[in-house]
Amino acid sequence: MTLAVRRWAIVPAAGQGSRFGAGLPKQYVAVLGRPLLSWTLSSLLAGPRVDGIVVALAPGDRHWRDLPEAHDPRVRHCAGGARRELSVANGLEALAGNASDTDWVLVH
């Protein structure tokens, strides 16, 4: 029996954007009327090539639940880390129970 290869995406989004100076994390800054993170997630979800997404978020993120994509069953979230590589590691750990050894993982 051959298992279908699934494709997952990890989106590190735990940054605070303090250098960006917008008053909120840059992933939530509106671009053409939508938060940047919403554009990213909707683009990944629109294609047939991504089976699921894990978004690594800062503890206490107050903006996540406002995104429509946060309620899509293909999208889950995990705690982000203090640095990008820690957020990616947490995303991989969050996939551990669902992804198989032959699956692919895209890191945005």
Predicted regions and their residues:
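N-terminal glycine-rich phosphate-binding loop and ensuing alpha1 helix
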Residues: 6-59
